[in-house]
């Protein structure tokens, strides 16, 4: 394993935003420097997320490097980085792509400047392609479940959960999404009882990641079936689809006593107002885990949330232990060709085609 810091080039190839809905490949983008608690990663693979297209379409930052999920090799580290990380480590992570505050920090680049305390070392047997699928889905699921939804249970002490079996149910709507499979797996590892909605075609997938039971979201009786299965005790729902239909389904599936509902987009207030006294709704933006101000237009803007970053660091430690023990699996991927040209096309693909049960990954 290399012990000396290699000399980084001054410029690199990266995909940057040009205008709303438009990206370009640029060959003279400045390589970021390793500041405090920052690791520079030589990118080996990147993954495409729906947010890549959404942010480009509705909140572009011209000239900023785009992309969130990556995997690669650490080639440089700044001061105060975690002692367990070394130059030469194979790692996975994610960053705030197309960031107005840090325009040279994005995953769609030859070199990525990543917060070192949110990086995961990957096992030797895990490919960079598989590892590239981890970042955004993992931290969205973790933040949603343990920080926002406040489910009982702990990844570090799953056997210490002292609640009745019928109080352990957690519904994951959209269980076959990349965030959904991460959520199901985390819940199972924390000693809880994940149940999921998905299509019939993806039921085997959600069962493989640990769902106790899967429900066909297209069945008109879906919510009633969930109530019957849980005995009317469901008190936690994570909505990974974030549409009006799934909000309504989650509300209808929850028990009479209510509970908490968390989604990944602003929820429909008209639905929330149907059970204002029993269900506490909220929605999250995973970008807050970096502990910095999120400079995005409208209701997606956030002040810095140090508590979210503290939680994310703790989650990283817990998931690192699971990876080291071989207990954490990755979401199914579809490996694509084309390098940076392919990545650019992939963002267009995710805009028009739903990726059911898999994630597009590009070796670069």
From Swiss-Prot:
NADP(+) binds at residues 51-54, 176-179, 199-202, 217, 264-265, 355-356. Pathway: Secondary metabolite biosynthesis. Its EC number is 1.-.-.-. GO terms for molecular function: nucleotide binding; oxidoreductase activity, acting on NAD(P)H. The gene is traG. Trans-enoyl reductase; part of the tra gene cluster that produces terrestric acid. The clavatol biosynthesis cluster cla and the terrestric acid cluster tra are both involved in the production of peniphenones and penilactones. The non-reducing PKS claF is responsible for the formation of clavatol from successive condensations of 3 malonyl-CoA units, presumably with a simple acetyl-CoA starter unit, and 2 methylation steps. The esterase claE probably collaborates with claF by catalyzing the hydrolysis of ACP-bound acyl intermediates to free the ACP from stalled intermediates. It is an enzyme of class 1 (oxidoreductase). Transmembrane segments: none annotated. It comes from the Eukaryota. It comes from Penicillium crustosum. This is Trans-enoyl reductase traG. Belongs to the zinc-containing alcohol dehydrogenase family. Keywords: NADP, Nucleotide-binding, Oxidoreductase. Monomer. SUPFAM superfamilies: GroES-like, NAD(P)-binding Rossmann-fold domains. Pfam families: ADH_N, ADH_zinc_N.
């Amino acid at each position: 394993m290399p012990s000396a810091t290699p000399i980084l080039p001054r410029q690199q190839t990266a995909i940057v935003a040009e205008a709303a809905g438009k990206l370009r490949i640029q060959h003279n983008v400045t390589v970021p420097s390793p500041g405090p608690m920052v690791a520079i990663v030589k990118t080996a693979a990147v993954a495409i997320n729906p947010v890549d297209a959404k942010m480009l379409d509705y909140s572009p930052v011209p000239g900023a490097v785009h992309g969130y999920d990556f995997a690669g090799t650490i080639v440089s580290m700044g001061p105060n980085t975690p002692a367990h990380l070394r130059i030469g480590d194979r790692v996975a992570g994610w960053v705030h792509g197309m960031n107005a505050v840090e325009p040279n920090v994005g995953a769609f680049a030859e070199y990525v400047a990543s917060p070192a305390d949110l990086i995961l070392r990957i096992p030797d047997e895990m490919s960079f392609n598989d590892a590239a699928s981890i970042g955004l889905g993992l931290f969205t699921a973790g933040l949603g479940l343990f920080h926002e939804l406040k489910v009982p249970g702990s990844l570090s002490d799953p056997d210490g959960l002292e609640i009745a079996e019928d109080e352990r149910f957690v519904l994951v709507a959209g269980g076959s999404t990349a965030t959904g499979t991460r959520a199901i797996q985390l819940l199972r590892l924390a000693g809880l009882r994940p149940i999921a909605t998905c299509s019939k075609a993806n039921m085997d997938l959600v069962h493989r990641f640990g769902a106790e039971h899967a429900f066909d979201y297209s069945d008109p009786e879906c919510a009633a079936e969930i109530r019957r299965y849980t005995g009317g005790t469901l008190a936690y729902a994570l909505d990974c689809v974030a549409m009006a239909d799934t909000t309504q389904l989650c509300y209808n599936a929850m028990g009479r006593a209510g509970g908490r509902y968390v989604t990944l987009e602003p929820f429909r207030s008209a639905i929330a107002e149907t059970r204002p006294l029993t269900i506490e709704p909220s929605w999250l933006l995973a970008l807050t885990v970096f502990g910095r101000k999120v400079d995005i237009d409208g209701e997606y803007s956030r002040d810095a949330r140090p508590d979210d970053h503290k939680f994310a660091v703790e989650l990283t430690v817990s998931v690192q232990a699971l990876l080291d023990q071989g207990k954490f699996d990755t979401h199914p991927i579809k490996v694509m060709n084309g390098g940076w040209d392919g990545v650019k096309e992939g963002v267009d693909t995710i805009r028009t085609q739903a990726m059911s049960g898999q994630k597009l990954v590009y070796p670069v």
